[in-house]
């Protein structure tokens, strides 16, 4: 073999068992590497890179890195680096080197060396040097194969054993099968290959190339792969390649026990350049049948596959695991990145990455910390499928564990057609699939304008009849900003969970972000794993695994294997594996992928997905989904985190720090831990924990606990704990505890917006507590619903109402102004549709708590139903399109304005309800309240309406609970005081007794409104509106059933009797003898008068007129001199056609 080029159609078989072919060593070469093919000699390069293929001459090289083109002054431990210019002072220990010039002064222990020209001053320990030059045709490179039959061939202790096979241009039908192991009935353990890289640069004009690398396809074999520390694989494929198959690190064994362990810092780099057709990149696949395959210990094993423009029908199937009847364990892949940048004009591209589709197998994926996948895809894609991190096993026990800091970045630019982004999917059938321990595993997919038929299916999990547990996804964001117009038929299906007959456990995904900013951030200090700067970075300290600068960075200390900066970020400290900022300055980001369009300033972001279009100012988000969606597209379905399990056994646990936050504008001075942020305008100083936020106008001082928030203007200084928050106009200082509060304004035709749905059947544990209420729809649920129940005729069989103000399941105003718009919000099984082609389906709670909010329609007719068992989910349909007040910055206290704007008034009623809840919480903990707290936590932007909101809220809690607020000092500090005192009538005088007296007045008022009696069902239905439920202790009233049926009956305030001829027995309440006293009647009248003043303006005038009529009748009774006569006349004359008794 000598110094000549490899012959055409040659097959070098390297390092096979029972055969050795040592060559004469060159002079001065000290090599321990089995294969070295340098193309040129780098000079004085001091690196630890495993793969090195310099194109220029280097001197004095001491290399342990097989592939390296280092910049000047760079100290890197990255396994893969390909500089464009010749480095100087290269000192490498790379086992594989391919130089075209003769090395001088080489001390070599390599048994085989084939170099074209001697490099000078190179100190190499590579045992094998084999340059394969251009014009290969039908070449088979079968390297490190082990195919014995009935043999025990142990491969052990190959430290620094590199393989470098540069394949140049004009190669046709080339098969590169590397590190394969296909023995039959064999026990072949592969152990101890530290720093064993594989470098296969493949240049232009390839046709039907198969790159099958690190495959393991034994049959009936026990094959153990262990200890491949720093074993990178680099396969740069240049333009005009057709029908290329890159099948890397595959494992296709049948009836085999194959164990892959200890691949520390084993990177795989496959840059694929433009004009590809029908390319298949199948990386790190594991598809054994009836096999026990264990993949363990691949720390810092990156895979980089940059694919450039004009590729057609490309399949990137990466890190797949599709065994059948197999026990496949993937463990310990820290910092194992996969980078696949793809440029413009792709057609029919399939990116199937990190898939796991075994059948009847036990597949365990564990320990992949810092294993990023980067696939930047540029414009003019057609029919692209990005299927990433999928797990679709059938009848399989698949466990995914320990993938900290494993980002996936797929930036895709404009003019996409028929693109499918199916990412992090898990759709196993009859499988036990456990996803655990993916901290800081980001996925970044920036998708820009002019999309057509794009499917973004991200982090889906769709099991049926499954035990699906979603645990521990703190800061696991997905940010997919979809930019300006001409998007057609876009589906955003995020965080879905729909497996069939599967036990799927998702655990421990802390800080797993997906960030796709579209503009450059300024002053950003980022730990984001993927960032692309367009120019030279200066003094960057990067731990990110992929770093490919176009020009040599100066004074750079890089631990990341791949780094491609385009512009110099200044003062950047990056721990993220992929870092491609356009021009961020001083960014400190923990999100793995960051693609900002405009510079956020002073941003400290831990959110994985970040798509700001303009800066957010002073916002602190803890809500899981905050995104005002303004999509100007046609036929766009948007499906947000759905959960469709049937017979699911366990619900999601804990209020995780919200998954989706998508601001469309860059934030300034933002400290963000939220995964998705895409505001259109700039919130300043935002501290966000919320995963999805797409505000359109700024919110100021909002504190939101609601789960869905889509404001149209950017929120400012917002503190949100809610997962979804979609207000139409900016609230100020809001404190949302409702899980879904979202006015959705969609300006599109035929748009479907599906927001977090939950269709479980037979759930075992319903949501509990105030913070776990899935949907809170503030239709002034305290007093509005109470009043509606008071003013309606009694119902026959209402369900037991929901409990507590904080557990009201629906609080979400939805305002949709498109034609043919479907808004499906947190639905259970029933789905209701409504006229005007607008469907707003809002969730029902548990069977005991079907509904807690009245339904209001601002059309011609108003329906307030008692919500019996047959009643559907509450629907709020708005036909008014006057939402300018919602975005107005100049809010004034105008009652006439409130009267004329029902939608705006509805929002003020929400504020009244929220403030009342906030005051009750303060009352329970016995703390005073200040005006500043109310403005900051609830009122937010509505400071001009604070007097109206505060007056109604304090009147409401005084009416229903007998609790008033008194100002105690000039700084607007208030304390709570009980106001009801019936001691003269023999009532209790202690604090609880006073509150119970107020409840008694309420019940007597209900009976009075109904006539002479009220059924037990009506009483409990009204009380449920204020959180008082039978059999459950209340903070102010105690146990209410005992009060109503025993205590007050014994004290003769109430009469409790059975309805005659009722089967099953039904009961009703009447006034007792002591209730007819002067004091009690006067209290009832005062209560009704105060209740009339707190009636929401949105209620029709007929209800206010009815309440006024009741008040006048009661006042007439009080004014009558003869008390007994007045009582008799009241019982006979208070009846009206609209309020007939049962």
UniProtKB/Swiss-Prot annotation:
Q: Name one Pfam family in it.
A: MAGE
Disulfide-linked positions: none
**Where is it made, tissue-wise?**
Expressed in testis and in tumors of a wide variety of histologic types.
- What residue spans carry the Polar residues bias annotation? 92-103, 614-626, 671-680
Location of the protein in the cell:
Cytoplasm
Domain (MAGE) spans 908-1106
Question: Compositional bias (Low complexity) spans?
Answer: 13-42, 76-87, 627-659, 741-762, 807-889, 1123-1142
Q: Which GO terms describe its cellular component?
A: cytoplasm; nucleus
Q: Name one GO biological process term.
A: negative regulation of transcription by RNA polymerase II
Keywords of this entry: Cytoplasm, Phosphoprotein, Repeat, Tumor antigen
Q: Where is this region: Disordered?
A: 1-132, 502-778, 791-893, 1118-1142
> Which positions bear Phosphoserine?
63, 207, 382, 1063
Q: What is this protein called?
A: Melanoma-associated antigen C1
Q: Which species does this protein come from?
A: Homo sapiens
Gene name as annotated? MAGEC1
């Amino acid at each position: 073999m000598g110094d000549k080029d490899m012959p055409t159609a040659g097959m070098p078989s390297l390092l096979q068992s029972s055969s050795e072919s040592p060559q004469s060593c060159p002079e001065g070469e000290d090599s321990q590497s089995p294969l070295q093919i340098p193309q040129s000699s780098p000079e004085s390069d001091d690196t630890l890179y495993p793969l090195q293929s310099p194109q220029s001459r280097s001197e004095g090289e001491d290399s342990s890195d097989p592939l390296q083109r280092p910049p000047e002054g760079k100290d890197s431990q990255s396994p893969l680096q390909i500089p464009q210019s010749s480095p100087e002072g290269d000192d490498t220990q790379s086992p594989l080197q391919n130089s075209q010039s003769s090395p001088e002064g080489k001390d070599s222990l390599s048994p085989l060396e084939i170099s074209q020209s001697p490099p000078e001053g190179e100190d190499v320990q590579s045992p094998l040097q084999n340059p394969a030059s251009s014009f290969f045709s039908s070449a088979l490179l079968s390297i490190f194969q082990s195919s014995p039959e009935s043999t025990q061939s142990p491969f052990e202790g190959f430290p620094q054993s590199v393989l470098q096979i540069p394949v140049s241009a004009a190669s046709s039908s080339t098969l590169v099968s590397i590190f394969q192991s296909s023995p039959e009935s064999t026990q072949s353990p592969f152990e101890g290959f530290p720093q064993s890289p594989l470098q296969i640069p493949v240049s232009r004009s390839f046709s039907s190339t198969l790159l099958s690398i690190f495959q393991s396809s034994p049959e009936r074999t026990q094959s153990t792969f262990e200890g491949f520390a720093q074993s990178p694989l680099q396969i740069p494929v240049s333009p005009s390649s057709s029908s290329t198959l890159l099948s890397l690190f595959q494992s296709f064994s049948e009836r085999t026990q194959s164990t892959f362990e200890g691949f520390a810092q084993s990177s795989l780099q496959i840059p694929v350049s433009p004009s590809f057709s029908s390319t298949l990149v199948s990386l790190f696949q594991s598809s054994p049948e009836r096999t026990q395959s264990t993949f363990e210990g691949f720390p810092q094993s990156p895979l980089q596959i940059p694919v450039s423009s004009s590729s057609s029908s490309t399949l990137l199937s990466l890190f797949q695991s599709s065994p059948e009847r197999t026990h496949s364990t993937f463990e310990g892949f820290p910092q194992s990145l996969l980078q696949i940048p793809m440029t413009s004009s792709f057609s029919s591209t399939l990116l199937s990455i990190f898939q796991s589709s075994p059948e009847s197998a036990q597949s365990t994926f564990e320990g992949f910390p810092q294993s990023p996948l980067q696939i930047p895809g540029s414009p003019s894609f057609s029919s692209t499928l990005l299927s990433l991190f999928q797990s679709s096993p059938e009848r399989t026990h698949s466990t995914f564990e320990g993938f900290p800091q494993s980002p996936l970045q797929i930036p895709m630019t404009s003019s996409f057609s028929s693109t499918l982004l199916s990412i992090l999917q898990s759709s196993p059938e009859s499988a036990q699939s456990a996803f655990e321990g993916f901290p800081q595993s980001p996925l970044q997919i920036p998708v820009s304008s002019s999309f057509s038929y794009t499917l973004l299916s991200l982090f889906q999990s769709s099991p049926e009849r499954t035990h699906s547990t979603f645990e521990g996804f703190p800061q696991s964001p997905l940010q997919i900003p979809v930019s300006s117009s001409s998007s057609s038929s876009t589906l955003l299906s995020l965080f879905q969970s729909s497996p069939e007959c599967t036990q799927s456990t998702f655990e421990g995904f802390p800080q797993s972000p997906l960030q796709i900013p579209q503009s450059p951030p300024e002053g950003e200090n980022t730990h984001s794993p993927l960032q692309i700067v367009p120019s030279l970075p200066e003094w960057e300290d990067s731990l990110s695994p992929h770093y490919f600068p176009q020009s040599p960075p100066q004074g750079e200390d890089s631990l990341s294997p791949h780094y491609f900066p385009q512009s110099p970020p200044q003062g950047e400290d990056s721990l993220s594996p992929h870092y491609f900022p356009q021009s961020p300055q001083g960014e400190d980001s923990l999100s793995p992928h960051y693609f900002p369009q405009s510079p956020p300033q002073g941003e400290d972001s831990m959110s994985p997905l970040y798509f700001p279009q303009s800066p957010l100012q002073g916002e602190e988000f803890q809500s899981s989904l905050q995104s005002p969606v303004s999509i100007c597209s046609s036929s766009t379905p948007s499906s947000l985190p759905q959960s469709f399990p049937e017979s699911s056994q366990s619900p999601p646990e804990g209020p995780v720090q919200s998954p989706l936050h998508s601001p469309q504008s860059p934030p300034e001075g933002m400290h963000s831990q939220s995964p998705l942020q895409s505001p259109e305008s700039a919130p300043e100083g935002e501290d966000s924990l919320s995963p999805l936020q797409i505000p359109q106008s700024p919110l100021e001082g909002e504190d939101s606990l609601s789960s869905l928030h889509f404001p149209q203007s950017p929120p400012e200084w917002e503190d949100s704990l809610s997962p979804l928050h979609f207000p139409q106009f900016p609230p100020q200082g809001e404190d949302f505890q409702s899980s879904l509060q979202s006015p959705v304004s969609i300006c599109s035709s035929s748009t479907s917006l599906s927001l977090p749905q939950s269709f479980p059947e037979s759930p075992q544990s319903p949501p509990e507590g105030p913070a776990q209420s899935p949907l809170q729809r503030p239709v002034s649920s305290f007093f509005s619903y109470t009043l509606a129940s008071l003013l309606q005729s009694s119902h026959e069989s209402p369900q037991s109402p929901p409990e507590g103000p904080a557990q009201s399941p629906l609080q979400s105003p939805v305002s949709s102004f498109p034609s043919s718009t479907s808004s499906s919000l947190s639905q259970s099984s029933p789905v209701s549709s409504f006229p005007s082609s607008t469907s707003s389906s809002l969730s029902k709670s548990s069977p005991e708590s079907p509904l807690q909010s009245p339904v209001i329609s601002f059309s011609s007719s108003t329906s307030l139903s008692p919500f019996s068992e047959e009643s559907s989910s509450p629907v709020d349909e708005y036909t008014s399109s006057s939402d300018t007040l919602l975005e107005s910055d100049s809010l004034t206290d105008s009652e006439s304005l409130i009267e004329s704007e029902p939608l705006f008034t509805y929002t003020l009623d929400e504020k009244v309800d929220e403030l009342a809840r906030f005051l009750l919480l303060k009352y329970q903990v016995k703390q005073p309240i200040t005006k500043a707290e109310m403005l900051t936590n609830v009122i937010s932007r509505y400071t001009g309406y604070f007097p109206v909101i505060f007056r109604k809220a304090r009147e409401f809690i005084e009416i229903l609970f007998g609790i008033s607020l008194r100002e105690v000092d000039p700084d607007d500090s208030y304390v709570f005081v009980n106001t009801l005192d019936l001691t003269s009538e023999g009532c209790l005088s202690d604090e609880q007794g006073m509150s119970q007296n107020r409840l008694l007045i309420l019940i007597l008022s209900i009976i009075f409104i109904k006539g002479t009696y009220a059924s037990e069902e009506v009483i409990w239905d009204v009380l449920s509106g204020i959180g008082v439920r039978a059999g459950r202790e209340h903070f102010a009233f105690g146990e209410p059933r005992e009060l109503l049926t025993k205590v007050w009956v014994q004290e003769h305030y109430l009469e409790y009797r059975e309805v005659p001829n009722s089967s099953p027995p039904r009961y009703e309440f009447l006034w007792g003898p002591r209730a007819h006293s002067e004091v009690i009647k006067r209290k009832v009248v005062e209560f009704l008068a105060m209740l009339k003043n707190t009636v929401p303006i949105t209620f029709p005038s007929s209800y206010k007129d009815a309440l006024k009529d009741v008040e006048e009748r009661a006042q007439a009774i009080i004014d009558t001199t003869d008390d007994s006569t007045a009582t008799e006349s009241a019982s006979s004359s208070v009846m009206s056609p609209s309020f007939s008794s049962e």
